[in-house]
Amino acid sequence: MTYGAGGSTRDLTAELVIDMNRENDFPVMAHLTCIGHTHDQVKELLDQYAEAGVENILALGGDPPADGSDPGGEFDFACELVELIRAHGADFSLGVAAQPELHPRSPDHQSDRRWLAEKLSMADFGLTNFFFDPNDHLLMVEELADLGCHTPVLPGIMLFRNL
């Protein structure tokens, strides 16, 4: 369940995630972005998800607002969100984003892989954005292994389903 994709509103996402988790016989993975959030807001969402039995979270940095305004909030990077989720106490299955072709905000290749390895070290798995060359994914996994990171990184695919 996406959360503020493209900088859009995320007002109903938690309610929809909780409803889908309760009403369907398949696991729901809540996307949770940190952009524009305070720590207390995220803790409140995590409390709601834990209380409702939501077990899976994909922790993301998130897109800036579509209008280009300052999103505010207390987070700068997804690693900070992952740390907060791990400290929460609920036993969420926690995924993070990975970009085989490098994160758009990365200053260079080496720092991109170091930050990704750090983020993955706190997660259960990584999930990539879409990519077209499978060699990019294979190279990323090799580079992460060279850094001592062996957390699984799954190729992202798009499944279309309307509920």
Predicted region positions:
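Active-site-proximal loop/turn and secondary-structure-junction residues that shape catalytic pockets
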Residues: 3-7, 34-36, 61-65, 98-102, ...
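Conserved, mostly hydrophobic/aromatic
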Residues: 49, 119-122, 155
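Active-site glycine-rich loop that binds ribose-phosphate moieties when present
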Residues: 105-121, 126
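Active-site mouth loops of central-metabolism enzymes
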Residues: 28-40, 95-110
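Active-site pocket-lining/capping segments in soluble small-molecule metabolic enzymes
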Residues: 73-100, 105, 147-163
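Active-site-adjacent beta->alpha loops and helix N-cap segments on the catalytic face
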Residues: 7-20, 38-44, 63-85, 106-109, ...
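Hydrophobic faces of well-ordered beta-strands that scaffold small-molecule active sites
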Residues: 1, 28-32, 57-59, 94-98, ...
